[in-house]
Amino acid sequence: MSVDISVIIPLYNKGEFIERTLKSVAVQDISNWECIIVDDGSTDASVEIVKEFIRVNPGNWKLISQKNSGQTSARNHGVRLAQGTYLAFLDADDLWPSNKLRLQFGALESDRSAVLVLSAFAIFRDHNTTARVVRHRDPLKMNKRWLLMSGFGGGLESVGMVRRGVLLDDELFDSALSTSSGLDLSLRLAELGKVILLAEIGLYYRINAGQWHADTNELGRNLDILCERYQNRFSQNLARSHSAYLFWVSARGYGTRYLVVSFVRSLFTLRNGRLSILVNLIWRNIASSRLGKSKRSETVSAISKLDR
């Protein structure tokens, strides 16, 4: 059976969440997809949960196992097995609204010059509390500079869909970047063709204890690599994006430690650190927004239906 979309889910010790994640794929309102789950040597009940889900919910599911090599390796493994024209990635603890694949598939099908589509996403904590929706206010003005400034491409792992034909075997997710491989791939794709940004929410992004965000030093190391890699390839000063990204992460509630580290880092790595922080923080607030009461209730309700 031919498929248009390959969904790739790297899995490592997400037994608490993986069934809900798979359920959000199963309820997509189009059926032209396959789902490849790549287990990265889980030591909990994740694999057994996936097998039972597939037994009860027959469909185009594939469970692959590999020796523990990291999420990036698992994603790349899935890409190499994929049969679809398009690739969509989903982390094993995140959720998709039911129209995610249809909207992104339609966007790429209607514009053959586009290589990547990204959607807005809602951030939520356990207990279904939505913190913010991150979106661009004018999708028609999406370009490479905005992608770079905003760091939005860091969400490719769950929020994007890419045209598989533009990826080469040696240019997939970079295994040297444990926390920013999605942003790196987005930046490379932005050099190859058009990037579409949809205003509709395409991801419910879960914040929970134990995420990589807890390792500020590793995040900083990854972004240092990206600064060196891209500073001469884009007109926008990537150092500012680097600093602003760390600051933005802290502002999203990932912890006081982020706030202190990113602020100090900004002051000492930029010539005009305070101004850069102010300008980029204003930019971030333009690019994202808190939900109004009715929309918040609607989004929380949608998450609640999936996250149980």
PLM regions: where:
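Glycine-rich, basic loop-to-helix element that forms the pyrophosphate-binding segment
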Residues: 66-82, 103
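Short aromatic/hydrophobic "clamp" motif used to bind/position activated sugar donors
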Residues: 87
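Cell-envelope/extracellular polymer assembly enzymes that use nucleotide-activated donors
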Residues: 3-6, 34, 184
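C-terminal subregions of glycosyltransferases and related glycan-biosynthesis enzymes
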Residues: 191, 204-308
